[in-house]
Regions:
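Serine-dependent protease modules
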Residues: 2-266, 271-273, 279, 319, ...
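Conserved PDZ fold ligand-binding element
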Residues: 79-80, 290-315
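A general beta-strand register signal
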Residues: 99-100, 206, 299, 306, ...
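PDZ peptide-recognition modules
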Residues: 254, 286-287, 301, 314-315, ...
Length: 352
């Protein structure tokens, strides 16, 4: 009797590799027409003094401030990118030049920045523009293949890198290149697909060519550790712009850390999930004065376990649950304080 299983295994493996390659190419080709390069310039005024006459004149010029990547999310030109991409220049003095993969160029209007996440929205004015399909980041699993696309290093337009989802629900402290500005990002996707400088604001794509994340940061102390904002966390921003014309976010008004086994051990509590309201020794308030959290009676050291019956844990962070509700919504909080469970209520206001 002859056995051909090893040969068949090789054929199957070759076919799987070919299928994976074809799927990757299809996904990239589907998305790239809607991936744009963003060039930010700012108009500056310089005072020139004539040494002979002492006369002063003002000269205006444009200075390039930075670049990044964005994605067109609607046929009428809404563009999603990172807040830190547009933050390099003032909103009133900046110009945003948009370059499509086809070579077409536009100047974009600034729509708004997300006050709680590293997201911003621009708009170009045209019809029938190429746009991406939004996926469902809640369905992502560790090990899933993903592709990061962006304007790498500000020079290599629409570069694509491939990897897998390495982790979900990560909480990171992200800073700009200067290190002067930092922001805590909750619930981000970790991937080993290289996210190079300039890729910020570009899409993280699954093999069906659907956007599952917005590339946002890389850990420069490690190798192949990149992060993306889940597209489902961006959907409220998109919905708000479409319905209201600006970005509206709800606010509770606390600074917190999601519980981890390490933090729970440090705090010497028996809980394994929830949002711990920070106890800050630097004078920074963890419950903002006059905020809905303040009015509810939340205190530093409290652990918010549930909001309206939704348990706070890895994928349902305090921030993500709050964003399910509009400003003015009444919410109930199940809180652990001094070994006891208490129930508090409050009304959310708008994050400004």
């Amino acid at each position: 009797m002859n056995f051909y299983a090893p040969q068949m295994t090789g054929v199957i493996a070759d076919n799987l590799r070919l299928d994976d390659q074809e799927a990757t190419i299809r996904a990239i080709n589907k998305v790239i027409p809607a991936v744009v390069s963003i060039i930010i310039t700012e108009q500056v005024t310089t005072t020139v003094i004539n040494l002979n006459t002492g006369q002063q004149t003002e000269q205006k010029s444009k200075v390039r401030k930075g670049s990044g990547t964005g994605i067109i999310i609607s046929p009428d030109g809404l563009i999603l990118t990172n807040k830190h991409v547009v933050n390099v220049a003032g909103e009133k003095t900046a110009e945003y030049r948009i370059i499509l993969n086809s070579g077409r160029q536009y100047y974009a209007q600034f729509i708004g920045k997300d006050p709680i996440n590293d997201l911003a929205v621009l708009k170009i004015f045209d019809k029938n523009l190429p746009f991406v399909q939004l996926g469902d980041s809640d369905k992502l699993q560790i090990g899933a293949t993903v592709i990061a696309i962006g304007n790498a290093l500000g020079r290599y337009q629409n570069s694509a890198t491939k990897g897998i989802v390495s982790g979900l629900g990560r909480n990171i402290e992200a800073s700009d290149q200067s290190g002067n500005t930092s922001e805590t990002l909750d619930n981000v996707i970790q991937t080993d697909a290289n996210i190079n400088l300039g890729n910020s604001g570009g899409p993280l794509v699954d093999l069906d060519g659907n956007i599952v994340g917005i590339n946002v940061a890389t850990d420069q102390t490690g190798s192949s550790i990149g992060f993306a904002i889940p597209i489902n966390d961006a959907k409220p921003v998109i919905k708000s712009v479409r319905e209201i014309g600006r970005i509206v976010r709800s606010r509770l008004g606390v600074r917190y850390h999601m519980l981890t086994p390490e933090l729970a051990s440090q705090l010497k509590i028996g809980l394994n999930s929830g949002a711990w309201i920070s106890i800050n020794n630097d004078g920074t308030p963890s419950v903002l004065d006059g905020s809905p959290a303040d009015k509810a009676g939340l205190k530093p050291g409290d652990i918010v376990m549930e909001i309206n019956g939704i348990k706070l844990q890895d994928k349902t962070t305090l921030l993500s649950v709050i964003q399910k509700y509009k400003p003015g919504a009444k919410i109930g909080l199940r809180v652990f304080r001094d070994g006891k469970i208490i129930i508090l209520t409050t009304v959310l206001d708008e994050f400004r």
